[in-house]
Amino acid sequence: MNIYFWILLWVYIFIPYEIKKEERRIQHIIETHQPEIVTMTTYKAIAEECDSTPNITASGFVITNPKKHRIIAVSHDLKKKWKWGTKVQIVGAGKYDGTYYVRDLMNRRYNKRIDILIGHKDKQTKLKKIKVYSI
């Protein structure tokens, strides 16, 4: 058989199967685990909202495309629970629902709070009682 057949088989059968498997795993976690209930805000990678190096997160991750990276900053109390790179699922935040990675840290004055990195032209948002699951 030729190599293109195997590539097509991989693309059309194996990859969708793996995606569905991951979706089922996340759904199981949502149904069986207690979420962290937080206030969610958004932030932009600009000096006015960060520090003098807005394109480098507290974990050292370099931001090249804010929307693509799916980054959240967490308050210091949540940082004790979630280490750098932890994958989390956000539920109840409308268009912000989905999978994100813990890569940044918020100011110490905040508790039980996450900040979602958005693009420079996006509108700022604040939502309360958002569910966050460690996946």
Which residue stretches match the model-derived regions?
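Hydrophobic membrane-insertion alpha-helices, especially the h-region
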Residues: M1-P16
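Solvent-exposed, well-ordered loop and adjacent helix/strand elements within mature globular domains
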Residues: P16-I135
